[in-house]
Amino acid sequence: MKRCRSEHVPSRLPRKKCKNHLDMRSFLSLFASKKSNAHDASSIVLNEKVNFVTDNDHLPSSTGVCEFCDNVLYLSTCDRCQRNICRNCSTLMYFKENTVARCLDCL
């Protein structure tokens, strides 16, 4: 059924937040509150990134291939098992001293 001119689709759909979704301000307020049940966020480094090795010309890196998908670009090593992993097959883990990449098996 066609819509007439008076009926239009709203350009912005209302976004409802469920109780599982937090915005950034609410997330940071959990750590900033002085209550006894608040968590300490000073040990988490959020702005540090893992350096995935690649050449400037997007050539294959010299460290090998990814053990999961055979990708040759953007490689790093898992901090537990020391296997080569690419950016798509890894998960970043944030710690106080640094940020590391972990492979899918070590999670």
From Swiss-Prot:
Source organism's superkingdom? Eukaryota
Protein name per Swiss-Prot or TrEMBL: Uncharacterized protein C4H3.16
Organism, scientific name: Schizosaccharomyces pombe (strain 972 / ATCC 24843)
